């Protein structure tokens, strides 16, 4: 009974991300604060007159464990310094620490999601596959942030699947 109460309290506290777990730390898997732009900044950047449409202010990412979701918007300008900073927004240990608050004896769903330049990628699995999910999330984040706008558009929205290309090649022979 006590464990169920603690888990319920942890969920409520995680939703507001104000809970101090140990030594003043928070329960969130993220090491950087949310950097969401103000409404005015967002409107100026995305206005018709803006010449910087191919370079978003940043990206959104989230980790979820069961019904508890942790979200962040991080500034990213495409530089090597910015890439290094944002790749360190969470680490294996911080994700494991946050997840351990919600993972009990039964398996729950774990999900990592990243949205950048209009493309969204979500990785999910059960709590027993969390370590593999973390490895995949690290690679996915690095790859996605290093793509140019043309690569994102070309690979995601305008490119035909490889299977159809192979099929056309066989027909022409």
Curated annotation (Swiss-Prot):
Keywords: Host-virus interaction, Inhibition of host innate immune response by virus, RNA-binding, Suppressor of RNA silencing, Viral immunoevasion. The keyword RNA-binding applies. The keyword Cell inner membrane does not apply. Residues 1-34 are annotated as: Disordered. It comes from the Viruses. GO terms for cellular component: virion component. Gene3D superfamilies: RNA silencing suppressor P19 (3.30.390.180). SUPFAM superfamilies: Tombusvirus P19 core protein, VP19. InterPro entries: Tombusvirus_p19 (IPR004905), VP19_sf (IPR036131). GO terms for biological process: symbiont-mediated suppression of host innate immune response. Homodimer. Belongs to the tombusvirus protein p19 family. This is RNA silencing suppressor p19. It comes from Cucumber necrosis virus (CNV).
């Amino acid at each position: 009974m006590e464990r169920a109460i603690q888990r319920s309290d942890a969920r409520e506290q995680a939703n507001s991300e104000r809970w101090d777990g140990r030594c003043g730390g928070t329960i969130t898997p993220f090491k950087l604060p949310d950097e969401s732009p103000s409404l005015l900044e967002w409107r100026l950047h995305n206005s018709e007159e803006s010449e910087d449409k191919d370079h978003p202010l940043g990206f959104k990412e989230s980790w979820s464990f069961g019904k508890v979701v942790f979200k962040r918007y991080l500034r990213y300008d495409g530089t090597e310094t910015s890439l290094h900073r944002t790749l360190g927004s969470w680490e294996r240990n911080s994700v494991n620490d946050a997840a351990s608050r919600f993972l009990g004896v039964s398996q729950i769903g774990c999900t990592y999601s990243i949205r950048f330049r209009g493309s969204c990628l979500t990785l999910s699995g059960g709590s027993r596959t969390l370590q593999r999910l973390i490895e995949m999330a690290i690679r996915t984040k690095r790859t996605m942030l290093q793509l140019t706008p043309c690569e994102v558009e070309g690979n995601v929205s305008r490119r035909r699947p490889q299977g159809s290309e192979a099929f056309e090649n066989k027909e022409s022979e």
